[in-house]
């Protein structure tokens, strides 16, 4: 593990964890309010993210403030999007498609579990061919399960412990195989968690 890799990921995750403001805010406002807010933020973020590749002024602005947390692949290509755009899109889609408390849980898992998995994986894990590690994925699953149980007891949503475990396994798998799925995990994690929690009760 290179020190510079861990330092870079730490800076990204500090910024990533600041998104905790969204689930906290959603606790106190109705769905329509958070959906409208996220629609505005997502639209602006996507616009700036796309146009920065072809607009020198926007690119200079983005580079000035976010160069230390943007990965190289997020700068390559005409329509390459940053993680924040995928996160906002994931937040917006789940907010309009799924029940409030389930959505809050999925956001917390993305924000907290993904951060812990990345930092633990880089610090002590052995990187596999997909850039992930067993230690990181195990950390993701355990923290996601812990968050799910807390939300289930304190906020409540219509599910069972079996479904919670399945959903956490699914979210962990999506995070682990994100490179092969070719879907940014900031989008796929909340969507997969909400989808599995919603669909599996009808299957099992």
From Swiss-Prot:
<dbReference type="GO" id="GO:0004143">
    <property type="term" value="F:ATP-dependent diacylglycerol kinase activity"/>
</dbReference>
<protein>
    <recommendedName>
        <fullName>Uncharacterized protein RP860</fullName>
    </recommendedName>
</protein>
<dbReference type="InterPro" id="IPR037997">
    <property type="entry name" value="Dgk1-like"/>
</dbReference>
């Amino acid at each position: 593990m290179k020190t510079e890799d861990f330092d870079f990921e730490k800076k990204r995750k500090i910024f990533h964890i600041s998104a905790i403001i969204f689930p906290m805010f959603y606790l106190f406002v109705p769905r329509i309010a958070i959906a409208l807010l996220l629609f505005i933020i997502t639209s602006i973020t996507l616009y700036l993210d796309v146009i920065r590749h072809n607009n020198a002024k926007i690119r200079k602005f983005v580079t000035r403030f976010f160069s230390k947390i943007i990965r190289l692949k997020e700068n390559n290509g005409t329509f390459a999007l940053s993680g924040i755009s995928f996160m906002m899109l994931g937040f917006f889609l789940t907010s309009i498609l799924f029940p409030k408390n389930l959505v809050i849980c999925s956001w917390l898992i993305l924000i907290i579990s993904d951060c812990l998995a990345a930092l633990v994986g880089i610090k002590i894990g052995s990187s596999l061919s997909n850039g992930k590690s067993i230690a990181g994925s195990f950390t993701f699953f355990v923290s996601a399960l812990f968050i799910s149980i807390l939300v289930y007891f304190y906020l409540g949503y219509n599910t069972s412990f079996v479904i919670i475990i399945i959903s956490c396994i699914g979210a962990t798998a999506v995070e682990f195989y994100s490179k092969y799925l070719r879907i940014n995990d900031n989008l796929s994690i909340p969507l997969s968690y909400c989808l599995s929690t919603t669909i599996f009760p009808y299957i099992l």
